[in-house]
Structure formats: C-alpha cells, structure tokens
C-alpha cells in the first residue's frame, strides 16, 4: 500500500493586497433616512486607482469590506461581527467592484446574533463608513444617516 502524499503548502500570491495607495472606497446609502425598526441598504464600492499593472487583491465580503455604523464615537453596528465566507477579487486599472450591505437598524454586540434578537437603534443621526479590514487608513468618507 502506498502512503498518501502530504498536502503541499498553499502558495502566497505575488499580487499585493489592496490598500489606501491603490484603491478608493465609497459608500452610498439608498436614502438619507429610515424609521426605527427599518433597514438601510448601502452600496459599497471599491475602485482601483493604482498604477501597477498587476493590480491588487481585496476581500469584498462583508468581513473584508467592513461597514461601521457609529453614534458619535460609539460603535453601534459592524458588518463583520458574524462570520462570512471570504470573496477575494483581483482588481486592476479601470476595475470597480460594488456590493450591497444592509444595516438592519439594530445595535450589534461583539458576538454574532440574529438581527431579530438585537435591539433597534433609537431615533437620531448616525454615521456610516466603509473600511478594509487590516488596513485602517483605507476607508470611505463617512456619510450621515437619520433614524426617524
């Protein structure tokens, strides 16, 4: 009987991860406000603006492109609290990747929970910002959202 060969180590790509030097993030809410108990869809966009021909790799899942909702300095909700599968994309000159991220209008904790089990946020003004996990400087401009 032959031995089963050991698996080979995964090779690391020579293509760099995307960061603030080669991508621009933008975040567009579907509306400027919504009611308590409602939800808000955001269009998250990452556009390659680097000069390298090889481009860069970015995880466009909700764990890699993180939507953060804040009230002042208080973090109210983050899209990466619950685990999701990664979705790495190679982007290069002229490429733009868009996806929809939905904030269920609730306050999340540090552990994954169903949105139905979490408290609705109160009326008020919140800020939303998109960032790339592991690259603190790679983020969109914050946008204001009103919960009525």
PLM segments and residue spans:
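Primarily secretory-pathway and cell-envelope proteins
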Residues: 1-92, 131-132, 136-148
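N-terminal helix-cap/turn-to-beta initiation motif at the start of protein domains
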Residues: 13-15, 117-123
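Beta-strand-connecting loops/turns
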Residues: 37, 123-124
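Short linear sequence motifs
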Residues: 81, 96, 119-120
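Short Pro-Gly-centered flexible turn/kink motifs
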Residues: 90-104
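Signal that preferentially marks extracellular ectodomain short beta-strand elements
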Residues: 100-120
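A short tyrosine-centered beta-strand micro-motif
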Residues: 124-130
């Amino acid at each position: 009987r032959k031995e089963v060969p050991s698996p080979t180590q995964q090779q690391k790509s020579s293509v760099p991860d995307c960061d603030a030097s080669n991508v621009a993030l933008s975040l567009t809410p579907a509306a400027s406000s919504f009611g308590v108990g409602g939800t808000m869809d955001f269009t998250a966009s990452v556009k390659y603006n680097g000069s390298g021909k090889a481009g860069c790799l970015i995880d466009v899942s909700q764990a890699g492109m993180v939507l953060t909702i804040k009230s002042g300095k208080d973090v109210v909700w983050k899209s990466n609290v619950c685990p999701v599968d990664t979705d790495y994309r190679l982007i290069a000159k002229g490429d733009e990747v868009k996806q929809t991220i939905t904030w269920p209008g609730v306050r999340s904790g540090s552990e994954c929970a169903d949105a139905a089990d979490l408290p609705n946020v109160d009326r008020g003004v919140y800020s939303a910002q998109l960032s790339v996990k592991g690259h603190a400087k790679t983020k969109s401009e914050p946008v204001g959202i009103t919960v009525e």
